Amino acid sequence: MVMAAEASSQLSLLSDLTPPSLERTWLTAPHPTLPIVATCSSDKTVRVYSLTNFRLLSTISGGHKRSVRTCAWKPHVKGESVLATGSFDATVGIWRRWDSYGQTERGIEDWRHADSHDHVDGMGAAGINNGGGDSADEDDEEWRFAVLLDGHDSEVKSVSWSPSGMLLATCSRDKSIWIWEDLDDGDNNFETVAVMQEHQGDVKCVAWHPVEECLASASYDDTIRLWREDLDDWGQVACIKGHQGTVWCVDWEGAENVPSAPTDLADDDPVTAQWKKAHALSGPRLVSCSDDRTVRIWRRQPKEQHQHQAQPSPSGGSGIPSIIRPTGSDEFWDEECVLPQAHDLSIYTVAWSKRTGLIASVGADGRVVVYEERFIVGSTAEAMETDHPTSADGTAADSPAALRTEWRVIATVDGAHGIYEINHVTWAKRADRGRIEGTDEEVLITTADDGTVRVWTLKM
């Protein structure tokens, strides 16, 4: 893995989301299917904006007594939108709103085929009234505060739904991670499935694997931890060390990601096929960011590889039997690379695009940075033409290491929100009139201390 710095693309401000909050905003979460986002604010509210015209659709309030720090949309919900919110008041709220189109799939289909007037006037793409006055008040009332999840002893820092939408993970300053199951019984009942307390400090972030029920967490204790269920009991399967400061955020690579190439590669190209084969063995990678001003990427060792390397004894290799979890459930993660140094202060959020494979980072220096992974010219042909026996350390020759890649900084924006720190960044599908029809064009959304939320386009 090689790192390089070469800004070759341009980030341009498309629009602010208006009107902004008058207080600090923490995080913006794109809806999984509709062209809307939810923004968490220190004014105890969540604001829902349209990505078609960048206007405020509704304000969710009344559920929390302190700042709303985090939120996440539940996936795979038909006919309504479900939003989880986490607050400094130590509680988690579940909010529900019936979708005006009746079915999410129909709403998206109408969005894709709407004419330009539908993007600006009336009900908007999400079927939510964009008007002011009484209609806005009526819309706010349509958000139902369904249930309050109480259990944490201190500020809730992050919430995340599992890929199936049946599990909700929450984490807190109290050093704990809670997993709740949505019983989906029509009565808004949630059951506590697990409480994990292995972290030695404030837990800043939780993020679910894109396809598996595997949870990653990041903490003030400088570690990343991985959690899985084994025999109906949730527990830690890996503790990743490497950062020299608080780990603020973790995010997963998309399950189908393939690095960029000097020329476009078809899906059946041998290089693409080889990458996907090796990728399938280790699964999606993790990206993390920290107070130490680095962005790091981690890869799980395939089980066959770490069994070849370690061959542990039944007692766990040290002669001391494990009383916490069986050895067979442990995972081994390697630091694959540190991305090019691009920040001067703490990095608060990283976002790995599931569509393009690009990574974005933001932090205390007010800078937005975008990174791209590319196959190294010449390495693809070399990898395909050479016979690669298994190496002495057990690394298969057709691993991604044989197809060498490099990470480049392709775009930066300094002072993206003036003098203010940027708390969060995320990718979302572009939905405004300027989008290119028939493409999965994305926008980058940044959320900052000044209360503004900005939408950016990336010109490659």
Swiss-Prot record:
GO term, biological process aspect, one: iron-sulfur cluster assembly
Entry keywords, A to Z: Repeat, WD repeat
Segments of this protein annotated with the region Disordered: 301-325
SUPFAM superfamilies with a match to the protein in the record: WD40 repeat-like (SSF50978)
A GO term from the CC aspect: cytosolic [4Fe-4S] assembly targeting complex
Renumbered ranges of WD repeats: 17-59, 63-105, 151-190, 198-237, 242-308, 342-381, 416-457
Biased segments, Low complexity type: 312-324
The keyword Repeat belongs to this UniProt entry's keyword annotation: yes
Domain of life assignment: Eukaryota
InterPro entries noted in UniProt: CIAO1/Cia1, G-protein_beta_WD-40_rep, WD40/YVTN_repeat-like_dom_sf, WD40_repeat_dom_sf, WD40_rpt
Family to which this protein belongs: Belongs to the WD repeat CIA1 family.
Cited function: Essential component of the cytosolic iron-sulfur (Fe/S) protein assembly machinery. Required for the maturation of extramitochondrial Fe/S proteins.
UniProt-recorded name of the protein: Probable cytosolic iron-sulfur protein assembly protein 1
